[in-house]
Amino acid sequence: MIGILGGMGTQAGLDFCNKLAILNRGKIDQEYPLFILFNKSNIPGRPESIGVQTKNLSDKSKNKKVKKKYHSVLKSLLQGCKVLKESKCKFIVIPCNTAHYWYEDLKKKINLPIVNMPKEVFNHTKKKCKKNSSIGLLATEGTLKTGIYNKFFDRDYNLIFPNNSLQKNSVNKAIKLVKMGKVREANKIIKPAIEFLVNKKCKKIILGCTELPIAIFAFKSFQKIKTSKIFLDPNLILANSAMKRYLKK
């Protein structure tokens, strides 16, 4: 059984479940995959809980706050993983890119496999793109700051991000609008950031926040870009990986 730790955000978790079901359509109910979605929407905000500790003694109080926020999110993620483990799930997926900042500590504390979303996206990209290609990344500021994609991609690819203005006024706003249920508005807002990466000759664009595929694929916008298969949807890639692992059990 697949364990899905969702709620980051809720629509992203539901989007993952939908993709999981579509990937393995059954003719009857019994042919669909067994999975449990724990929509743990009370996990503290991930971008707000990311900070960089410094060695400056005057920043001790700041470092304590950073550490406290980090462990607050870790504790909540761990609680969710434990619920899925107790529900007899064989492995866990987390359809939230930023949450993978806590991946290594989670893995140490829970005796159950957790599929690493950024790693799966990297493995998928290796099959599609030559080394040293330019790869665009649309994501939260938290994901960009922590380098969870850089960790895998910097060895072989040139990751390109939107500039600060586009990050703030296009990407961040689009993500927020999806969380608010305003998908049509998000679809319009994200357009300048996509055009920026296309003009930078990116071979692929990673939709590195699970709200972004919802914004982009909900309507008929970007039809020409979509047909070029430039977008990499981490939720879909993760769902594919989960199904392969599930079918091996």
Put a short name on every predicted segment.
Residues 1-249:
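Non-catalytic structural scaffold of enzyme domains
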